[in-house]
């Protein structure tokens, strides 16, 4: 009976080992999944250094270059054409060199020149007339100002003469009156001084 027990113990020990190994193998992945990754310290992370961006000055050759402005044509701008009479010689055809281009019809050219000359002459004449009128107005104003000044001077002279005539006849009488008046004034002044120096005293009578 003893050998049977031993075999049973051996057989019972083997499956226990297998179950323990399987439990260990199952527990390993659980442990790895349950672990939390720790954040790395900031010192270990290397960032690229910031680069200095230097602004280009205005005197830089790139900024000094003149940019050509685009010139738009009449077709691109869609400008309306004005109703004007333009002779053939005025409009410059494309692809032609600079120079005078005369009109075939001399009569039309002469009419245009006559109209332009008449307008210019009229403007010049109007300017000349205006200038003459302004000169006449200025002369009239000057004459008025001179007449006013002369009238003022005459009035002043008349007033001066009247004052001089009044002073001349009163000069002889004024001398004698002046002496008498001066003596009277001196007496009055002396009497006023004495009255001030000697005040009025009250008199009391015992009865």
UniProtKB/Swiss-Prot annotation:
GO biological process, one term: intracellular mRNA localization
Molecular-function annotations in GO: mRNA binding
UniProt biased composition (Low complexity): 7-36
Biased composition (Basic residues): 195-207
Keyword Cell cycle among UniProt keywords: no
Subcellular localization: Nucleus, Nucleolus
Keywords: Coiled coil, mRNA transport, Nucleus, Ribosome biogenesis, Transport
Chief location bin: nucleus
Presence of keyword Nucleus: yes
InterPro entries named among the record's database cross-references: Loc1 (IPR037650)
Coiled coil: 120-166
GO cellular component, one term: preribosome, large subunit precursor
Biased composition (Basic and acidic residues): 133-162, 169-178
Region (Disordered): 1-71, 133-207
Biological role: Required for efficient assembly and nuclear export of the 60S ribosomal subunit.
Family: Belongs to the LOC1 family.
Quaternary structure, from the entry: Component of the 66S pre-ribosomal particle.
Protein name as it appears in the record: 60S ribosomal subunit assembly/export protein LOC1
Phylogenetic lineage: Eukaryota, Fungi, Dikarya, Ascomycota, Pezizomycotina
Gene: LOC1
């Amino acid at each position: 009976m003893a050998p049977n027990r031993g075999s049973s113990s051996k057989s019972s020990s083997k499956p226990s080992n297998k179950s323990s190994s399987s439990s260990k193998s199952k527990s390993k992945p659980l442990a790895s999944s349950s672990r939390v990754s720790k954040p790395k310290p900031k010192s270990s992370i290397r960032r690229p250094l910031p680069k200095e961006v230097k602004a280009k000055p205005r005197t830089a050759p790139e900024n000094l270059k003149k940019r050509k402005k685009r010139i738009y044509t009449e077709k691109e701008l869609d400008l309306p054409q004005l109703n004007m009479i333009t002779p053939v010689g005025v409009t410059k055809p494309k692809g032609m060199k600079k120079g005078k281009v005369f009109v075939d019809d001399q009569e039309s050219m002469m009419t245009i020149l006559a109209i332009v000359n008449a307008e210019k002459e009229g403007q010049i004449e109007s300017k000349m007339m205006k200038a003459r009128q302004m000169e006449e107005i200025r002369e009239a104003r000057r004459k008025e100002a001179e007449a006013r000044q002369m009238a003022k001077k005459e009035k002043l002279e008349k007033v001066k003469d009247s004052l001089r005539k009044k002073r001349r006849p009163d000069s002889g009488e004024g001398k004698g009156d002046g002496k008498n008046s001066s003596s009277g004034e001196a007496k009055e002044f002396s009497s006023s001084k004495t009255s001030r120096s000697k005040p009025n005293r009250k008199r009391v009578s015992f009865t």
